[in-house]
């Protein structure tokens, strides 16, 4: 399981690098070519501008609506990923028991461990890699959305509320909101896990700082995207991975197991007393 966590962490870092690397790319125009620029990002850019015109040439609303549309489109992938992750968390105690049982490092024992793990995964309908496939599909979409907003020059000429979309937020409202929503979504997801590791905890506190510093120094169009996307992520986490509900259910299961063991122990003692009579 640690191996898969490391892979997920590496993917997260890769996503950050790819997203931030988009800051130095050239503007997207009708003359942009190639699969990534000419097909993906250009059409994302056109969709945002079309929506902006639909809402009275408001580029701010265009960014908001298109961001929400993209997040809703990839929501089924998130549902699948979250359910698989929750199922993986639930089988953790059984996985640890198997690892303890087959703790020897010789090849034969490790083969038995792998066979038992496969049976456990099949029984509960989960697989570690199943959580990564949706992530690999989502990342290019979200990166394309990010770059479409960053590299579409027309979006930087508009205004929205107190913002000039091509300039930094003068009051730092959007950077602060983006950081708050980033922390909230990460914290909620972390609290839903039965065990928190150091990597998860570090990223929960590190990512909001990165988002805050970056959002302070980029045009408001990009900060607006981060606010909407991360606010959606908070709602999504509360819907799919609500830690308060999950922890209540987890505690109820533990209490039921304690009650079952207590009942069995009482029955055992009663049987011993009756036998002595």
Curated annotation (Swiss-Prot):
The record's InterPro entries line, in alphabetical order, gives: YidC/ALB3/OXA1/COX18, YidC/Oxa/ALB_C, YidC/YidC1/YidC2_Firmicutes, YidC_ALB_C
List residues with covalent lipid attachment of type S-diacylglycerol cysteine: 23
The subcellular localization recorded is:
Cell membrane
> Which GO biological process categories is it annotated with?
protein insertion into membrane; protein transport
Would I find Protein transport among this entry's keywords?
Answer: yes
Give the highest taxon in the source lineage. Bacteria
Record's signal peptide: 1-22
**Which terms in the Gene Ontology molecular function aspect does this entry carry?**
membrane insertase activity
Q: Where is the composition biased (Basic residues)?
A: 267-277
- Annotated lipid attachment (N-palmitoyl cysteine): 23
Any single GO CC term annotated in Swiss-Prot or TrEMBL for this entry = plasma membrane
Give the stretches traversing the membrane: 35-55, 60-80, 130-150, 170-190, 208-228
Ranges for the region named Disordered are 251-277
For membrane topology, the record states: Multi-pass membrane protein
User: Compositionally biased, Basic and acidic residues: which spans?
Assistant: 251-266
Which UniProt keyword terms apply here? Answer: Cell membrane, Chaperone, Lipoprotein, Membrane, Palmitate, Protein transport, Signal, Transmembrane, Transmembrane helix, Transport
Query: What family is it from?
Result: Belongs to the OXA1/ALB3/YidC family. Type 2 subfamily.
Protein's job? Required for the insertion and/or proper folding and/or complex formation of integral membrane proteins into the membrane. Involved in integration of membrane proteins that insert both dependently and independently of the Sec translocase complex, as well as at least some lipoproteins.
Task: Cite the PANTHER family for this sequence.
Answer: CYTOCHROME C OXIDASE ASSEMBLY PROTEIN COX18, MITOCHONDRIAL, OXA1
The name this protein goes by in its record: Membrane protein insertase YidC 2
**Protein source organism:** Lactiplantibacillus plantarum (strain ATCC BAA-793 / NCIMB 8826 / WCFS1)
Instruction: Name the gene.
Output: yidC2
């Amino acid at each position: 399981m640690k191996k898969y966590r490391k892979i997920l962490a590496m993917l997260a870092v890769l996503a950050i690098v790819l997203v931030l690397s988009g800051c130095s790319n050239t503007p997207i125009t009708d003359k942009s070519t190639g699969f990534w620029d000419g097909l993906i990002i250009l059409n994302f850019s056109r969709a945002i501008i079309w929506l902006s015109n639909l809402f009275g040439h408001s580029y701010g609303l265009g960014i908001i609506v298109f961001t929400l549309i993209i997040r809703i489109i990839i929501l089924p992938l998130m549902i699948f990923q979250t359910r698989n992750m929750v199922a993986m968390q639930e089988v953790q105690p059984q996985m640890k028991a198997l690892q303890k049982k087959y703790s020897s490092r010789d090849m034969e024992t490790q083969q038995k461990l792998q066979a038992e793990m496969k049976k456990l995964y099949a029984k509960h309908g989960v697989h570690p890699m199943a959580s990564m496939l949706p992530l690999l599909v989502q990342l290019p979409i979200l990166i394309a959305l990010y770059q479409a907003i960053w590299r579409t020059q027309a979006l930087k000429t508009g205004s929205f509320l107190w913002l000039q979309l091509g300039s930094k937020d003068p009051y730092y409202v959007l950077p602060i909101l983006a950081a708050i929503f980033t922390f909230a979504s990460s914290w909620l997801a972390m609290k839903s896990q039965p065990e928190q590791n150091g990597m998860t905890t570090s990223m929960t506190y590190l990512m909001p700082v990165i988002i805050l510093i970056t959002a302070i120094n980029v045009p408001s169009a990009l900060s607006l995207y981060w606010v909407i996307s991360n606010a959606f992520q908070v709602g999504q986490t509360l819907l799919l991975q609500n830690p308060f509900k999950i922890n209540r259910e987890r505690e109820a299961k533990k209490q039921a197991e304690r009650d079952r063991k207590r009942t069995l122990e009482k029955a055992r003692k009663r049987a011993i007393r009756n036998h002595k009579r």
